[in-house]
Amino acid sequence: MSSNFTKALSLLSIEALISSTSSVTQHSVFFFKADFRFFVCFWSIWFWTGDISFSLLSMLVKSGPYNTVTSVSLFQLMDSGLDLEFCKP
């Protein structure tokens, strides 16, 4: 498979994950599920592309019903200019 094809496939999977969380309520159990799905999305992008852009992270946070703690933490990372290279092995 070509690299572009696998990236496109990964992004489609991520879009499906995000849309599947659209009915998440404010119950703490659903918060956990939403956070779990967010990190599945996060690591899926990293696995397929080998890179994470802050604009993409921002898009994911804004488009999903993720809890405030996760969103604030990610935006603090972005504001501080911290690179996510430390996530790579």
From Swiss-Prot:
Subcellular location: Membrane
Keyword Membrane: yes
Membrane topology note: Single-pass membrane protein
Alphabetically ordered keywords of this record: Membrane, Transmembrane, Transmembrane helix
Major subcellular location class: membrane
Superkingdom classification of source: Eukaryota
Protein name listed in UniProt: Putative uncharacterized protein YKR075W-A
Additional observations: Completely overlaps YKR075C.
Membrane spanning stretches: 39-61
Lineage: Eukaryota, Fungi, Dikarya, Ascomycota, Saccharomycotina
Record's GO cellular component terms: membrane
